[in-house]
Amino acid sequence: MPMHDQTSYMTGFGNEFATEAVAGSLPVGQNSPQRVAHGLYAEQLSGTAFTAPRGENRRSWLYRIRPAAVHGRFSLIEQSRLHNDFGGGPVPPDQMRWSPLPLPATRTDFVDGLYTMAGNGSPEAMTGVAVHLYAANASMRDRFFYNADGELLLVPQLGRLRVCTELGVLELEPQQIGVIPRGLRFRVELLDSEARGYVCENFGGLLRLPELGPIGANGLANPRDFQTPRAAFEQREGRFELVAKFQGHLWRADIGHSPLDVVAWHGNYAPYRYDLRRFNTIGSISFDHPDPSIFTVLTSPSDTHGTANMDFAIFPPRWLVAQHTFRPPWFHRNVASEFMGLVHGVYDAKAEGFAPGGASLHNCMSGHGPDAATFDKASQADLTRPDVIADTMAFMFETRAVLRPTQQALNAAHRQADYQQCWSGLRAAFQPPTTEDAT
């Protein structure tokens, strides 16, 4: 049976799941029996240290047709669009914005379509992130990929994806996200003729739900809305290619079978998807615009309490009702660095120039905020009426470390050289009181 005919999901975030595509494949009461049912092999996939605290420990046991060790020797793939070289050269403090990444003119699958924009940290140190775009027009048929450097957060903007993994099938569409754990093998099939989107490669602590604090027990992204696939497998032999991302480079090896041959598995280290339209948005119902941390969907913790390695936040449809308040996002300089993208519609802080598929980067202490047209409109708005922002889905990868743009991003033809001009219309309107006014 093809894998896509086995697509179904289990619900919950970080749950201890157990699933089998063939009845009787999961051992009862133990992980590694002397002989696994149906002639399968037992293999553990560890996403954290064995000794990580129980509440943070992530691992799954896989029962598969062949162990993951069965493949040929790896050789380096010479390519230049995907890398983790963020260490050299000065980083300009400019605000930056890019138009959408052009779609490919020749056959390009997901792996070949990856394009690194910026990053910080390193896979060696297991801290930081890399931000990539992807643009593809072909499915991965006899090719499989895994990333040993970090987990992958996929944000589709154009076109639907079917992500066939060792642990089951994720189908994603724009306004949904998918997370692929570090090390998990998968292939990406296009369900439409073209696909484009964003990828955050997280080298640091595994993504988790943010603490809710005074919000209470419910709100933001609710755990029940996350979906993890049930076991699904394929048994194919032939000439296939296994591509690995390891220490910032791509490597390839021959493999004589499909590695998506896990018949059953149990554990809490698994891929998942989430529909951003289910996010329970929190906002002010009195005055002022709260800090954007209230829009956090997932967070990767750092070694500093209260400071994330990376936060993934969204700006979804919502009502703005704050009184005597400038309702759009305010002008800001931030110790953190912000990479933004737009999946759908219009972003409420930018009247023009920020298109779906585009991106912006506001690094540490770079001033940013609404453009002149948005400021003028919001400053004169009738606050007796709510602003209903109904047609939007923007997002942000916010990192504690500076995001160092790659040379290809700095020199890209789709970089908007005149981005700073969106603030040029913000004129000085200060009128100090006269002596008569003071009296």
Curated annotation (Swiss-Prot):
Residues at which Fe cation binds: H332, E338, H368
Gene Ontology CC terms: cytoplasm
Catalytic residues (positions): H289
Record's keyword terms, sorted: Dioxygenase, Iron, Metal-binding, Oxidoreductase, Phenylalanine catabolism, Tyrosine catabolism
One record GO biological process: L-phenylalanine catabolic process
InterPro entries found in the cross-reference section: HgmA_C, HgmA_N, Homogentis_dOase, Homogentis_dOase_bac, RmlC-like_jellyroll, RmlC_Cupin_sf
Pathway assigned to this chain's UniProt record: Amino-acid degradation; L-phenylalanine degradation; acetoacetate and fumarate from L-phenylalanine: step 4/6
GO molecular function: homogentisate 1,2-dioxygenase activity; iron ion binding
Enzyme class of the recorded protein, top EC level: oxidoreductase
Enzyme Commission (EC) number: 1.13.11.5
Record's catalysed reaction(s): homogentisate + O2 = 4-maleylacetoacetate + H(+)
Residues that bind homogentisate: Y347, H368
Domain of life: Bacteria
Cofactor requirement: Fe cation
Family annotation (Pfam families): HgmA_C, HgmA_N
Subunit comment: Hexamer; dimer of trimers.
Function according to Swiss-Prot or TrEMBL: Involved in the catabolism of homogentisate (2,5-dihydroxyphenylacetate or 2,5-OH-PhAc), a central intermediate in the degradation of phenylalanine and tyrosine. Catalyzes the oxidative ring cleavage of the aromatic ring of homogentisate to yield maleylacetoacetate.
Family statement: Belongs to the homogentisate dioxygenase family.
The protein's name in its UniProt record: Homogentisate 1,2-dioxygenase
Gene that this sequence comes from: hmgA
